């Protein structure tokens, strides 16, 4: 049986709706017609080609644009888009544990990706009670913040602790059987969340702060805390997250820059708790990823089946 890939972070609906990219196209065709300066890396076809069995697909709204009503409207529009894709047979939303194993069996034959839905940032929730309707439609994961602070917690770009409302939201997540994504969370709030929340935890898309000094990435101390919870870290092959000296417009970094983060994370978390979280087309494109990576299929050149898929599948099976 061929190994499969799991990508723990893809902004598919955001790309389709906000950037108006037709993700049903072959990737080469999308690159021909796409008007954006960043060359796209992802379409549904490129995921099938690479045997991406599971992708954590986001519901993402920029908290710097609009207000609560706008955010809520867009979250539900993105959710409806995923449901429409599922109705067309382009992908499958994985809502329950039984869906995961059934999907993996079918994926061997049809290579249709399965999506685990992730709300990236809780700013679109007016209260913890607004989480339940989203869970009923398939949401399984939540990150409390996207960069800036909100009513629930501080973010990586705006430090603040976990709030009382944030604690209530974490309790709501536990009751709904959801997982917590520590990405974009202020470190103080992340440690507080680990104390409050007893459910499954991970970081879908972050790198090693020891190699990339920035609050956006995980410190060694937070990696060790994640290890104690048997969580998984998804590493991001994005040059600006790999080398503090790299800036947009610079030549692409060698693949070794990404592998350094993998080695560091595996030393702290163990090789079974590090995986892939590309965040591809999340504000950058081909020009900003390491050399040798043109699309998902090229990640197989890393030759590590555990890192590319098995570690995330083990984590999902432990709670999903």
Model-derived regions: residue spans:
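N-terminal hydrophobic targeting/anchoring segments and the immediately downstream early-domain regions
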Residues: 1-160, 164, 213-320
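Loop-centered beta-sheet repeat module
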Residues: 159-195, 200-205
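Histidine- and/or cysteine-centered catalytic micro-motif in compact active-site loops
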Residues: 185, 206-208, 236-240
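Aromatic-anchored, glycine/proline-accented short structural segments
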Residues: 188-229
């Amino acid at each position: 049986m061929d190994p499969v890939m799991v990508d723990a972070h893809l902004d598919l609906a955001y790309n389709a709706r906000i950037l108006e990219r037709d993700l049903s196209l072959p990737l080469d065709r999308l690159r021909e017609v796409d008007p954006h300066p960043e060359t796209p890396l992802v379409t549904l076809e490129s995921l099938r080609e690479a045997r991406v069995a599971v992708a954590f697909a986001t519901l993402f709204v920029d908290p710097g644009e609009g207000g609560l009503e706008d955010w809520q409207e867009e979250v539900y529009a993105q959710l409806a888009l995923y449901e429409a894709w599922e109705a067309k047979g382009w992908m499958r939303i994985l809502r329950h544990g039984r869906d995961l194993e059934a999907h993996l069996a079918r994926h061997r034959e049809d290579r249709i990706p399965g999506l685990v839905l992730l709300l990236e940032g809780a700013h679109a929730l007016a209260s913890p009670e607004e989480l339940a309707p989203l869970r009923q439609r398939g949401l399984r994961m939540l990150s409390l913040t996207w960069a800036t602070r909100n009513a629930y917690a501080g973010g990586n770009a705006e430090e603040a602790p976990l709030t009382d409302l944030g604690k209530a939201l974490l309790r709501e997540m536990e009751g709904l059987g959801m997982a917590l994504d520590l990405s974009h969370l202020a470190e103080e709030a992340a440690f507080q969340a680990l104390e409050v929340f007893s459910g499954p935890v991970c970081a879908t898309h972050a790198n090693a702060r020891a190699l990339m000094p920035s609050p956006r990435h995980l410190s060694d101390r937070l990696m060790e805390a994640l290890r104690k919870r048997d969580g998984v870290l998804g590493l991001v092959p994005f040059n600006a997250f790999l080398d503090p000296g790299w800036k947009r417009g610079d030549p692409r970094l060698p693949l070794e820059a990404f592998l350094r983060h993998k080695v560091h994370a595996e030393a702290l978390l163990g090789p079974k708790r590090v995986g892939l979280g590309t965040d591809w087309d999340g504000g950058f494109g081909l020009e900003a990823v390491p050399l040798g990576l043109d699309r998902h299929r090229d990640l197989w050149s890393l030759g590590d089946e555990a890192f590319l898929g098995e570690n995330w599948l083990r984590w999902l099976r432990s709670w999903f």
